[in-house]
Design a protein with these regions (language model features):
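Residue-level signal for well-ordered alpha-helical positions
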Residues: 45, 106-107
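Beta-hairpin "wing" of winged helix-turn-helix
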Residues: 78-87, 94
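Histidine-centered divalent metal-coordination motifs
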Residues: 38, 71-72
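Short, charged/polar, Gly/Pro-enriched secondary-structure boundary elements
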Residues: 99-103
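N-terminal helix-turn-helix DNA-binding core of bacterial DNA-binding proteins
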Residues: 24-65, 91-98
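Short, hydrophobic-biased segments on the C-terminal half of alpha helices
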Residues: 42, 73-74
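N-terminal leader segment of winged-helix/HTH proteins
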Residues: 1-33, 79
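Alpha-helical residues within the helix-turn-helix
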Residues: 60, 71, 77-78
Length: 112
């Protein structure tokens, strides 16, 4: 009598998987991005095409108080997503292209 073949119920997993460090980095970034105001700020900056945007423009566009906008900008800056530039008494922000590339590089394999 011939032995029966073993049939696997699962498709073997293939490809590169997130390391613990990459997963922790994504978790940190998603926590920062998990706020609608920060997502709106990031959207404004991405639409600015690399140009710096003054903090006062966020206040006008978002309808938030200056301290609240500053808090959200600090969260995004501390996460490494934005860079800050001081011009006189005003602060200007822009997206760090390297940070967006890194985020895309981490998310793309997960998204497929």
């Amino acid at each position: 009598m011939k032995p029966l073949p073993v049939i696997s119920c699962c498709t073997p997993l293939a490809g590169a998987f997130l390391s613990d460090g990459e997963a922790a980095e994504l978790e940190r970034l998603f926590r920062v991005l998990g706020d609608r105001h920060r997502l709106k700020i990031l959207n404004i900056l991405l639409r600015a095409g690399g140009d710096a945007v003054c903090v006062c423009e966020f206040i006008d566009h978002l309808g938030l108080a200056q301290p609240t906008v500053s808090y959200h900008l600090k969260q995004l800056t501390d996460a490494g997503l934005l860079e800050r530039e001081k011009r006189g008494t005003f602060a200007y922000f822009r997206v760090r292209p390297a940070a967006m590339e890194r985020l895309h590089g981490l998310v793309e394999p997960v998204a497929g």
